[in-house]
Amino acid sequence: MNKTVETFDPKQTTTLETPAKTLAAEAKASDGTIQGNRIGFVSLGCPKNLVDSERILTQLRIDGYEVTNSYDNADLVIVNTCGFIDAAVEESLDAVREALEENGKVIVTGCLGAKENQIREVHPDVLEITGPHSYEAVLNHVHKYVPKPEHNPFTSLIPQTGVKLTPKHYAYLKISEGCDNRCTFCIIPALRGDLDSRGVGSVLDEAKRLVESGVQEILVVSQDTSAYGKDKDGRTDFWNGMPVKQDITSLARQLGKMGAWVRLHYVYPYPWVDDLIPLMAEGLILPYLDLPLQHASPRVLKMMKRPGRVDRQLDAIKKWREICPDLVIRSTFIVGFPGETEEDFEMLLDFLREARLDRVGCFKYSEVDGAVANTLAELISEEVKEDRYERFMEVQAEISAERLARLVGRELDILIDDVDEEGAIGRSYADAPEIDGMVFINGETELTPGDMVRARIVASDEHDLWAELVALED
């Protein structure tokens, strides 16, 4: 069961489960049908890394390679790594070790690939290492060790949207790379560089292809979604002969006209986030805001190099909910940041009680190699971190239960993700895949993943909802 308040677990929070399941299913379905050389593939990390994996896999298929999730019958294995926090680094290094032991020929890419010396020190036998979004370099390395098949009669079978590691009814849409912020606990700019926004026409073209292929939910991701277009100085681009400004509000407005759910992730709390709320109230995009706030103590926020006016944030949340009463706010916070005092932590709890956020992730501070925060102040003991985490979770669990209870009795659109012998499992507008809760519709075994249904909410807890089917929508 997915949780509203979660601790850090690489299998849940850093590495999504769905891509591995999808890759395994596709490999099984195509096993032996493509007479080309086989490439094993492991995709770790967040949705942004998942999109990188999809691009590499698409080009591999175009080049005639068969992709498999099995090491022993692959000619080579690619491991797309995560390097965000130390637990993710350990998971990535373990995956490389397993690939070397099972196969012996391994190419490493992704965020951890930006730290080649660290990988070579542990795994000197790795063939090649590239950093994140190095698609061309990865393919060139593959061609070097496993020559490209001369003929691939199956190229025409590759969907227009490319290979996807998500179910057919939802997809991640990455709108930019890198980040211009310098949060002291984060090393993403060192791994992925400064902000580099895609052209708005390119983004909208991809979104249109996704919707035309049957995607019903577009999850917009980047390192800093609300900063989209800042590096382009808000210049106007053109799409379908129409001028569109390169900023997140203009992009969201156009995405909202395509007829799919549009969900925004990783929205940094800039002032212009205010402009997105009316789009949610109008129903153009989902009234769901993934807004990582990280803390509520002005002193800690200053050490983090994050926006520090908590009173302004509370005022903003109040104003947003007045404009869009159905708004669901997800956020993440760090407890046990170096130098965090009991007073700082109590400020965080007070903020939770006043803000009444819907979905919250809590992370115990983890030392990240190269992060400035490690040297700012005395590190907090693991015992204190655990105590603060448990107290945080206890407070937020009660709030989450209260926020979900308000949905009981309402009819909501539910997007079905899975069906088993007990019934259907889906998500409402309040639930992003894998990180939020689920909606259980017991007894409805005739539904299909990708169905959009109308359901009446009959029960809730602090994480999930239970519903009764009202109607199957077109």
Swiss-Prot record:
[4Fe-4S] cluster 2 binds at residues 179, 183, 186. PROSITE patterns: MTTASE_N (PS51449), MTTASE_RADICAL (PS01278), RADICAL_SAM (PS51918), TRAM (PS50926). Keywords: 4Fe-4S, Cytoplasm, Iron, Iron-sulfur, Metal-binding, S-adenosyl-L-methionine, Transferase. InterPro entries: Elp3/MiaA/NifB-like_rSAM, Methylthiotransferase, Methylthiotransferase_CS, Methylthiotransferase_N, Methylthiotransferase_N_sf, NA-bd_OB-fold, Ribosomal_uS12_MeSTrfase_RimO, rSAM. Its cofactor is [4Fe-4S] cluster. The keyword Iron applies. Signal peptide: none annotated. Its EC number is 2.8.4.4. It is found in: Cytoplasm. The keyword Cell membrane does not apply. SMART domains: Elp3 (SM00729). Its main location: cytoplasm. It catalyses: L-aspartate(89)-[ribosomal protein uS12]-hydrogen + (sulfur carrier)-SH + AH2 + 2 S-adenosyl-L-methionine = 3-methylsulfanyl-L-aspartate(89)-[ribosomal protein uS12]-hydrogen + (sulfur carrier)-H + 5'-deoxyadenosine + L-methionine + A + S-adenosyl-L-homocysteine + 2 H(+). Residues 165-402 form the Radical SAM core domain. [4Fe-4S] cluster 1 binds at residues 46, 82, 111. GO terms for cellular component: cytosol. Coiled coil: none annotated. Belongs to the methylthiotransferase family. RimO subfamily. Catalyzes the methylthiolation of an aspartic acid residue of ribosomal protein uS12. This is Ribosomal protein uS12 methylthiotransferase RimO. It comes from Shewanella amazonensis (strain ATCC BAA-1098 / SB2B). The gene is rimO.
